Design a protein with these regions (language model features):
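Interaction-mediating elements
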Residues: 1-138
Length: 138
């Protein structure tokens, strides 16, 4: 179960573009990172420009006021190659939604399975599954 937070500046995107951004992120996770269909949990936050603080040229990128921060909490275990492909696919998909590649900042936060409760106040994975680190899956 990836949990995705997208943060962007107020007034820089339309509702249609935000939907396309969310769809592009989700599609990349399903196609590249082996996230199951219908395993979709996303939050889009629009914040005032005054509350979106970033270095516009850090590491040689040319970030604009339309920068998009993407933070994904997901089960641990994907390879560096899968992560690299995921980042590239997200940039491609978001590019189709009108977001410049230099304006995309992605952060993956890998979690152990025992750190998830999908509801009911219960550990969502059986103890045997929670104690092992997966190589694929959400």
């Amino acid at each position: 179960m990836p949990l995705v937070y997208v943060t962007l500046a107020e007034g820089t995107t339309s509702q249609d573009q935000r939907t396309r951004i969310a769809n592009g992120i989700y599609r990349a996770m399903v196609d590249v990172a082996d996230v199951p269909e219908d395993d979709r949990f996303q939050v889009i936050n629009e914040v005032s420009c005054a509350n979106l603080i970033y270095s516009p040229d850090y590491l040689g990128f040319d970030r604009s006021p339309s920068v998009v921060f993407i933070q994904i909490f997901l089960n641990a275990g994907r390879s560096v190659d899968v992560k690299r492909e995921l980042y590239a696919r997200m940039a491609e998909n978001l590019g189709a939604a009108g977001v410049r590649a230099d304006d995309i900042l992605i952060n993956l936060v890998e979690m152990a399975k025992e750190n998830w409760s999908f509801g009911g106040g219960e550990l969502s994975y059986p103890p045997a599954a929670a104690s092992s680190t997966p190589t694929t899956g959400s």
